[in-house]
């Protein structure tokens, strides 16, 4: 079943209990997909005439007096339930990536030549897998159609970017050329990602996130996905130590709504506190906030109907008092 969302928040004032794997709205199924009554699709992004990014977001739930110090920006218990489901889904996605990565992510984690695997990981993060709503569709098909060996230049003109694509379609050639130049300067992609021997896994993430941010058109989402998945797959010792919530992107906008503040430092602190108390990996908040904010679940190459851990759901409900 495809998720259907609407720009209108649910009208109920009291949330139904979040069943393990349920959608938090009391609907059928075990996928954790968000549903409502309309059919208007939210959370899509497209290039503005000026080349910027349009950020659309789910309307707020009705204020029913809900309050939690962990998520002070939320005034609706329905919003809190929906957030729980998306955070737990994102955590389940990480488990699958670590244990049995699907599709092209499995190739990145495989035993082929490392330079080819890193190049493929870059293309996946840059182009972005499709949403995965249709179980018959291969979320990596657009990437597979344009992938070329390392050292060759792909033609991304015909590509329809995924929902978390990391490039401006009009500047993709600049982004690819800049990435290749970055790798060449380092000596190889491998050396570029390894960085300095003294780096801790968290330091490696932060420094690479900063360096890749100098590439034209390389968005926050693409950088975060590339580095976090390389760490999850065990390709390099890379670990997320903070969410880097800044700029105009769905994850940051959602974080500001959830945590009720715009200061970057405080956003990261509140995100870490939420992850710690809910016993979730901090990196799960990246995709979890994105999906909560847009109201449309995307899996980044992973099925969107993963069964949600009932114990994780219950921990989060206790933590958020909902």
Task: Give residue spans per PLM region.
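C-terminal accessory module of base-excision DNA glycosylases/AP lyases that mediates lesion recognition
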Residues: 32-106, 181-207, 221-322
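Low-acidity, Ser/Thr- and Arg-rich intrinsically disordered low-complexity segments
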Residues: 2, 6-8, 12-15, 36
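Phosphate-/polyanion-interacting regions in eukaryotic proteins
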Residues: 80-83, 89-159
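Alpha-helical ds-nucleic-acid-binding substructure associated with the helix-hairpin-helix region
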Residues: 133-214
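Generic structural signal for hydrophobic core residues of well-folded globular domains
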Residues: 124-129, 212-215, 230-231, 255-259
């Amino acid at each position: 079943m495809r998720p259907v969302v609407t720009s209108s928040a649910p009208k109920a004032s009291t949330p139904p209990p979040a069943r393990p794997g349920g959608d938090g709205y009391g609907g059928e199924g075990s996928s954790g997909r968000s549903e409502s009554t309309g059919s208007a699709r939210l959370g899509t992004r497209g290039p503005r005439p000026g080349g910027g990014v349009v950020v659309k977001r789910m309307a707020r739930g009705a204020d029913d007096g809900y309050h939690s110090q962990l998520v002070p920006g939320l005034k609706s218990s329905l919003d809190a339930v929906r957030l729980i489901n998306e955070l737990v889904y994102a955590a389940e996605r990480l488990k699958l990536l670590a244990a049995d990565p699907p599709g092209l992510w499995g190739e990145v984690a495989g035993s082929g030549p490392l330079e080819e695997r890193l190049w493929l990981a870059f293309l996946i993060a840059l182009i972005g897998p499709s949403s995965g709503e249709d179980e018959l569709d291969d979320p990596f098909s657009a990437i597979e159609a344009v992938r070329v060996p390392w050292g060759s230049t792909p033609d991304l003109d015909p590509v329809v970017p995924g929902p978390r694509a990391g490039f401006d379609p009009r500047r993709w050639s600049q982004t690819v050329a800049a990435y290749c130049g970055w790798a060449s300067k380092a000596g190889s992609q491998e050396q570029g990602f390894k960085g300095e021997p003294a780096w801790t896994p968290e330091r490696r993430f932060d420094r690479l996130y900063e360096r890749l941010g100098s590439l034209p058109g390389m968005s926050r989402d693409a950088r975060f996905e590339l580095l976090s998945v390389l760490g999850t797959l065990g390709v390099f010792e890379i670990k997320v130590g903070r969410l880097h919530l800044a700029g105009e992107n769905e994850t940051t906008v959602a974080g500001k709504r959830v945590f009720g503040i715009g200061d970057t430092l405080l956003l990261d602190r509140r995100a870490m506190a939420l992850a710690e108390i809910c016993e979730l990996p901090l990196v799960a908040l990246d995709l979890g906030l994105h999906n909560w904010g847009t109201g449309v679940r995307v899996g980044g190459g992973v099925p969107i109907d993963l069964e949600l851990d009932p114990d994780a759901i219950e921990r989060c409900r206790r933590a958020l008092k909902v």
